[in-house]
């Protein structure tokens, strides 16, 4: 889908911070559209977007290094409000005539600000002399301010923790307002976009729905579209949005790759047939997928195989239907944001996204991606707009490669069936305990490890099942869910008693970072 024009946009210049997406989330939550652009192409992004304000992100880089990232001069020449965060503060000061030095005391974690001076950004939030918690993560620090700036708040280790040039509407902070550990951070960002930049909060999913439908109609015309319906929230919302735009030109195809949760394919088909007048084909391709995946242990190879087979199946089905010109996907904004390396080299790839990494370079259909401007929480709101049942919208995220990446090591039909049963029991216990909505994501993992056990009068040598549950706001950071031991004992007992092939259950207490939510 061609991106629609947004007259009131905030440009976020990304210098390589791990939490730049959180800045965008906070701006969107304030009802304002924004885009993240890497610093290398920020000048082009500035000219293309014609923003009403600019935010400069943090970075692992140091402004003291030769060739370190800089904001394009056009930003400071534009007269627009600018908000610098952490590294963004440092490069703003360095570029405008201030001074940055390597800090004698690196500051990481919780800190407290003392408000030294009234500031327009504090309106309705902070008052003179008040004290507020923030989250620091920096080594370098500003030691001399550019002309026109003054200190408005300090911390014990950061005398220039919050600075402002109110005449030019430049604001800069040494801490991270975008993270949840800065309780008033979201409000500070909201004040910047609304009260400083004067942008209306009219970025809503209702407005997005209308613009997206118009854009889909313009892109597709009278041609046919096949939608890759996985059964997840993203692809389901994409399907309903496209159906609203082009009606019977859309055919949804649900490929059962044999990697879904228990009864998932049947439940998805039933829901769409009962509630929506969609043309839906259910393709059982499990033999084909599992045949190629059997024995494959490398997680990246698994993803590539699954991505390739998905496209092959869709192209084959399109030919059976008489040809389709467009393939629809539920790709989200975090999937398409260009990763940034502040050194100028390639960024480290943690894992390929199944919508991106698995696609072949040559494809016989054009992509329609109506959700590519949205974050996950926005997709859920849009789903409600489109009438998806709350029970469906609130489902835990499920990866495109499915159970293949919850079965580390080589996979087989037997292992998948064992995992599927264990996962179903675990989720059933979570629902019975009334915990499902309190948990961001929960699932079982079948480890490639067998251990000795005793059942009845004999010894067993069976697999270990790991249970995972996390709490999160956005999936970018997560903490393990703190179950009581009675619940864990109950879930483990049911799994061991009811699933042949498992004789030991463990619970994963790793947060993200350092771990990821999924095991592969």
Swiss-Prot record:
Highest taxon listed in the record's lineage: Bacteria
A molecular-function term among this protein's GO annotations: GMP synthase activity
UniProt-listed InterPro entries: Class_I_gatase-like (IPR029062), GATASE (IPR017926), GMP_synth_C (IPR001674), GMP_synth_GATase (IPR004739), GMP_synthase (IPR022955), GMPS_ATP_PPase_dom (IPR025777), NAD/GMP_synthase (IPR022310), Rossmann-like_a/b/a_fold (IPR014729)
Gene Ontology annotations for the cellular component aspect, listed alphabetically: cytosol
Catalytic activity from the UniProt record: XMP + L-glutamine + ATP + H2O = GMP + L-glutamate + AMP + diphosphate + 2 H(+)
Residues noted as binding ATP in the record, renumbered to the chain: 230-236
SUPFAM superfamilies reported for this sequence: Adenine nucleotide alpha hydrolases-like (SSF52402), Class I glutamine amidotransferase-like (SSF52317), GMP synthetase C-terminal dimerisation domain (SSF54810)
Signal peptide: none
Domain Glutamine amidotransferase type-1, chain residue ranges per copy: 9-202
Keyword field contains Hydrolase: no
Cystine pairings recorded for this chain: none
Protein name: GMP synthase [glutamine-hydrolyzing]
